[in-house]
């Protein structure tokens, strides 16, 4: 098990495991002793490679005491990486190179928990052969990385995006991968742009959350970027257009931890439709179906399912119900497909808002809110109402210090804005937040917002970002 920040030693540990046929499992930093212990008890590792500290927004955060408390009584060895000490590198230099261990194509390479945005994380196991083929193909043909170019993803290595495109795919193609410790916008968004320009990054893979943060801070600076891909959440048309105008040509794509690499995408060679993630990639069969698995006509909202999932698909799933039913892989997402075969992702099916007879995906509401000039970020959930569910929205204002006395007026404007775009639905409830709760992979934790509003148990929040604050509601 690897418990390290975004430093080269984390990549060394992962690659070393791959070379000798061992299975690696990377865990996110910031877990408390109990959460870390639960994961270690589930994983039962023989070796834990752990850092004594990491940096968050420029400040050192000690974790050695957390690790020592978590491993009490567990049968495992710990290899410490001590910040500022040469001991770790000295041990590497003294070691003899290990011969690569031949393994079958489906031999487990790593185990990775899902992001846990809608519940308790599951353990996804990926193998060597198909996974490597899938991620290398995607980096070349979806993200269009060319020989000699530099690739950078803002995703941490503990997330599937970091595994696939922060480490393995760039190395498989002989490219250069840029790893950066700390938040992308630290110490400022300007530093992010300068880093891209100074290090000659050609292709960026980030999340809509990062793009929204950059937009909120003002106009971007020239970077030399050729492409800016987005993954992890729905990329709204408004943020797609901002990215094209201020950063680089956007490449939207959709996939999951279980799939290992993009399944739907709009590679730069294809016409883009802002708000639509794209078309099924080679080796992927996608459709929109009803509850019984029957195909729905274009323009209908339904379950996104896959008949074929591509070569990078997981080889095993631990601790969760199989997503396969009736010969189809049920993704858990609500989607639409248009007449040309382009898919639009509307949100997780368990987060769909049922307003009367209509089903509204949270992404639909959030995309509308993001077109308002005074909205920086937004999240939508369904809450009990008089005649079913009502829409509740949580908004981060564009202005960093939005006057408290003006919030009721803005709330009324946003209600009218939503009704103007979504049609006859009950007036939504509007709440303001300084920031939204996110997983460490950048996904909005809507279930936490809903739980806060209804006074319910939010469930597992161990994957929550460290700097989340509830803010204020009007």
Residue ranges and their predicted role:
Residues 1-31, 35, 152-157, 359:
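Conserved AMP-binding/adenylate-forming
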Residues 2, 27, 31-52, 197, ...:
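AMP-binding/adenylate-forming catalytic core of the ANL superfamily
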Residues 44-48, 65-79, 150-152, 178, ...:
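Conserved helix-loop-beta element of the AMP-binding
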Residues 47-105:
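ANL superfamily adenylate-forming
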Residues 81, 91-113, 120, 128-130, ...:
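Conserved pre-ATP/AMP-binding loop-to-beta segment of ANL
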Residues 132-150, 160-202, 217:
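Conserved AMP-binding/adenylation subdomain of ANL enzymes
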Residues 202-205, 215-272, 285:
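Gly/Ser/Thr-rich phosphate-binding loop
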Residues 279-283, 294-325, 342, 360, ...:
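Conserved ATP/PPi-binding loop(s) of AMP-dependent carboxylate-activating enzymes
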